[in-house]
């Protein structure tokens, strides 16, 4: 025990000079009595330090280099560190070598929490790892002892360092388990996708817009066959197939529309020809009954107007004043007397009755119009009002005579 206290006293000054802070477990840690040159905890802490240094300053892009450096850091760095520690411990006395391992262990944990370029200790990483939102099932013991498993702490540090130090490039330091997990998750995007969706990106060919040419026959199927050929080639791609179907449908609609227009033109020509034929037929039909009847006149050919002589008109006017409506016998008598037909006499009386009715209406309108005009004309005929004497100057002879007569009448009235 005395020897043990002496070794601690000798190492106290060296430790204070080395770390400038006392170790919390330097007196109570059971590992201080361990005489083995190196412990597993020392090796793991140094591996974490080397990985933190490489993660903060190194630039690794590929997954293969990440796995290679991870293996190199796991297997080669401990041997290099062993050689370096053996060289340093050979220079130190034996009592100080035992405490030197303990101080390196404690100093690694304290300096990692203080320095900004080194990772925090594993017991701090697990809480921060859960805050970053990563799934907890990636690690078997995410609440265990800080020095229980190297792979768990290293993977937790690598996930936190990817956001703190090196961004996206530091994710290459993940363990193979997390590396495969991430690529499996990202691979599901392409693995779960249908081959048609991939074909849309790789084998997409824009559908050519078919422009109608004036020399192209819309009823021919050459255009539709040329459009159906690429659809058979890209049958795997549903999007392009739909586009090609719409193009083929539009071409078929064009052909149908063109055929409909041709049919409409033919129908219009037929209608016009039938109309002309109907006109000819109606003319011939109207002329045939006129020729068959003989007495009746054809309607299409107007007969020239018959002019009545003055003697005939005077006789008809006298008969009309006597009687406006004639019987059949009276028409025959007048027709024989005037050398006219009974039909001409009948038509003349009809026209005369119509003219008489119009004349009565016109006469009434003219009479009303004349009456309206005569009313304002009667007012100027009345005598104007007498003009006062002081207005008229000098007075005329008539005015002087009128004035004298007026004074004489007034004097007579006064004497009476």
From Swiss-Prot:
Region described as Disordered: 1-33, 246-305, 391-416
A GO term from the CC aspect: nucleus
Classification via Gene3D superfamilies: Homeodomain-like
Annotated keywords: Developmental protein, DNA-binding, Homeobox, Nucleus
UniProt-listed GO biological process terms: cardiac muscle cell differentiation; cardioblast differentiation; cardiocyte differentiation; cell differentiation; determination of digestive tract left/right asymmetry; embryonic anterior midgut (ectodermal) morphogenesis; embryonic heart tube development; germ cell migration
GO molecular function ontology, one term from the record: DNA-binding transcription factor activity, RNA polymerase II-specific
Domain of life: Eukaryota
CDD domains (alphabetical): homeodomain
Consequence recorded when altering residue 173 to N: In strain: S-5F
Record's compositionally biased regions (Polar residues): 1-11, 18-33
Pfam families: Homeodomain (PF00046)
Listed name of the protein: Muscle-specific homeobox protein tinman
Source organism: Drosophila melanogaster (Fruit fly)
